Amino acid sequence: MAVALLVALCVVSSRMALPSEAVPFYRQDSEVCNSPVCQKAAQTLLESMDTSVDPCQDFYQYACGEWIRKHPIPEEKFRISPLDALYDNVLDTVAEILKNATSENHATSVLKSANYFQACMDAEARETQGVEPLKNLLTSLGGWPMATPGWSGANYHWQTQVATVTRNLGIRPIIDVFVDADANRTSQHIINLDQADFGLGRNQLINLTSSSRTQEIVAGYRNYIIASAKLLNPNADDIQLANDADEIIQFESTLAQFSTPPEERRDASSWYHKMTVAEVQTVTENTYFQWTEFLNTVLKEFPQVMPETEVILYERDYTKNVLKLAHETNPRILANYIGWIVLMKEGYHTTRQFRENKFQFEKVQIGIEKEEKLERVCTDHTIGLLGYAVGRLYVDKFFTEEEKQDIDELVENIRSAYKSTLRNNTWMDHVTRNKAIDKLEAMINKMAYPTWIKNDNELNEYYRSVPAINRDEFFSSLLKVTKVVKAIQLGKWNKPTDRIKDWITTPAVVNAFYSPDSNSMSFPAGILNWPLYQYGTSPALNYGAIGAIIGHEMSHGFDDQGGQTDPEGNLVDWWLEETKAKFNQKADCFRKQYSSYLEPTTNMHLNGNNTVGENIADNGAVRNAFIAYKMHLLHSQNNHVMRKKTLPGLSATAEQLFFLGYSTMWCGAERKESLEWSIQYDSHTPSEFRAVVPLTNSRSFAEAFGCASGTPMNPTHKCLLW
């Protein structure tokens, strides 16, 4: 592995005995699985591995060398991996379903999603409409000075426009307003006020000239703004456009300087500030921004916000400072900035040239070399907006109840393994340990899809306000549908939550989630596919791949952030101080370990602080999924013989298959520009390190491959938490 270990790591202080070590009277036997699914799995591994490499020296190259060689990054992508290939497959499948959906045997809401997709795909109608629908949108928001000759700010009220785009589009510039569970009373939804996201990366915005690479990205962003304005107003003065673009970037830079970086927001006590709207008015120290009026504009169709209404204010200083900044800023700059953020989010839904502008910026930012096809854009967009309706189509065709039950059983086996880990660790006091076990037992498993989407009446009721789709006027339909979908979330304000029915995702998604405020894991149907899961293949592979994904989300309940919430997801400190100190010491081991790695393409060190939660989860996932696999062997034994399924044509043992199943899902390559971006901002480490670092911390891996102590894959010093 082409990385350098630069600092000493924490020494493992304890180790739990695996089930295989505790029951030596069972005879272990292997049998080759020759079923079609096992033959497919064997072929996939053989085509991925470079067996000329010593696995104890460079396991990533051993597991992934051939896969990387055979899979160059496509021009339109910033990265390629088996997970990306799975995502592509799901999108292709969904696109075919949406193209061919008819009124026969489909719920009304499902047909609306198909019509929406087909309208999105009508490139000719888009070009006929041109940019006029976008210009009309911006006009309704007070105009965009860059594209509006003679614009006057005399009657422009930026607060009203921010509230309007928040309500109608879910776009939240300057101030982020959203409805979510109250983190300290998760049975109820509450209004949340937070710092906004930006059009450019925070690090670049804070210091616009910090490096030649930053200057290149900022220049690309500036060109993106100017080119977009030119599409709306071809006759605009170039000097004025350049000046406006510079003012937008400088204003956004100041916003970013007021913001708090993500690694400083991992402790909930830093952002959970519950108070009344009247108190927000006081602590933000202003008389020119009326919070009650602003929030009632956001929540226009819903119960009235009063001065005594409680909200959560995340960032007091940011909010106070940006309100003062906005008050002192020329209305033209405010209107240009808000209009730009709207245009950046929605412009590419109009003409081909807008999509070209977006591509030119992404070419600089993340290194892609070709624009993504419209079909891919429309599929992803439709899933994002009407995901439950699309998900219904997907699960009806591509997910069986048999598979769901099989994976549910796998989840419970990993939960049992985790419970064993908690019971047997030596660093937790018994009070904290018991509370951790209570939380684990209360953790909700949301598998594949919410059951209510299978009921036509319930699904139609959920989307009842979605209007009929006009295929000739896609952008108009987009605005109407978006407003309805955003109203569904805003409409939850002041209503109770439902830990079972409320999902954080929709079914046709290739990802997995842990939600701290509901203490629940979600595994959408999209991710429950090969190469992560295959019904009937070697259990070692399933436990190593989808089992590790499950273990990863389960571990999030006990990482540096998830560990701050109780079994119902409320912010509660349930740790005794001595145990908390030991937890922090072990978490610091991971911070130092990952920060010591140098990513060779970018010559950048990993950010062990921002990624610590994900790294804790990756390491806990591998350890507990392996324990669960061993437990599975015990439970499936017959006449005191544990039969391990191996694969044809491979000399790998079942234990080795487990670790190959884990690492091969992280095979891949990523463009340098994208890697630079992800190392700065992503809470996950790059795939190569996810594939390997948890294995260097695993004694079971070293035993499976016979790696001597002190080899790269079995270092003397290891980090261990769960």
UniProtKB/Swiss-Prot annotation:
Q: Which Pfam families match?
A: Peptidase_M13, Peptidase_M13_N
Task: Enumerate the UniProt keywords alphabetically.
Answer: Disulfide bond, Glycoprotein, Hydrolase, Metal-binding, Metalloprotease, Protease, Secreted, Signal, Zinc
The EC number on file is 3.4.24.-
- Sugar attachment sites are 100, 184, 207, 424, 609
Q: Name one GO molecular function term.
A: metalloendopeptidase activity
Q: Where in the cell is it found?
A: Secreted
Residue span, Peptidase M13 domain: 32-722
Provide the coiled-coil residue spans. none
Organism superkingdom: Eukaryota
* Positions bound to Zn(2+): 552, 556, 614
Active-site residues (renumbered): 553, 618
Q: Which residues form the signal peptide?
A: 1-17
Gene3D superfamilies from the entry?
Collagenase (Catalytic Domain), Neutral endopeptidase , domain2
Q: How is the cofactor bound?
A: Binds 1 zinc ion per subunit.
GO CC terms, sorted = extracellular region; plasma membrane
Name the CDD domains for this protein. Answer: M13 (cd08662)
Q: How is it modified after translation?
A: Contains 5 disulfide bonds.
Q: In which tissues is it expressed?
A: Expressed by the venom gland.
**What broad class describes the main subcellular location of this protein?**
secreted
Report the record's disulfide bonds: 33-38, 56-707, 64-667, 120-378, 589-719
Give the main EC class.
hydrolase
Q: Which cofactor does it need?
A: Zn(2+)
Q: Which GO terms describe its biological process?
A: protein processing
**Family label:** Belongs to the peptidase M13 family.
For this entry, the protein name equals Neprilysin-1
Gene source species: Trittame loki
Read off the lineage from the record: Eukaryota, Metazoa, Ecdysozoa, Arthropoda, Chelicerata
